[in-house]
Amino acid sequence: MERSKLSPLLLIPFLAILAIAGPLWVSGELPVFRDAGHFYYPSFHYEHALWNQGIAPLWSSLDDLGRPFAADSSASIFYPGKFLFWLPLSFASCMLVYLTAHLLLACLNTYYLARQFGVSTSGAVLASLSFGLGGAVLTQHSNIIYLVSASWLPLAISLVHRILQPSTKTDSARPVIYLGVTLALIVLGGDAQMALHVVLLIPLMHWFNRPKEKKSGIPYRKLTQRTTAACLIAFALAAIQVLPTYEWAQSGSRKIRSSSRTTY
């Protein structure tokens, strides 16, 4: 319990994010590098405009001859974090709130992960700065779905660590449920591959964290049960996005084409 408590030192990542995003707030500008400017912002703006008109953004008539907008996972219209676009602010302001909120979430979740592994408070804050504001994550402002998944990744890893611990049925249920919810948020945020990578990480973490005495570790059968339960919860919560995307993908050119696109 002590390790999960917040520290005043977390003001440091908050102030760092404020220093980065502050000038954008003052000038009313958005970073439009690469995919953000020509894909994500127009897509999110279209969704924002339809919601403001009281129309569910299920179909887009702006691409090709029309396409199922809700089936495009990168649109992430079912992601709960999109409630930030319902704030009584301009689209640009809502977009900045969305970006800065996920940067802050990445820092907080990294802090929690580091503390769970026994890192000191100052070390956990340093870890949160290194990950949340490091180049690999910070540059994802131009590829927003990956920023969203990166913000939830540390929490997912910490929950994987928890389900690997021997515990009673009551104690083991919570992290399994929380992991399922977190995986669903990653999928709904637009990056289903990250959720798959987290699941693939579970047996690896189990292997590297196995105790010297096998009897004190969690049995493989119980680990399989917990992993399966978490995946089922994630699928149930993210099915509203997964099923339309899967159905739409069946009519895509990659599905229809019989040969590989590459020369290999």
Please give the residue ranges for each predicted region.
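Membrane-interfacial, low-structure loops and terminal tails that flank and connect transmembrane helices
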Residues: 1, 167-171, 212-222
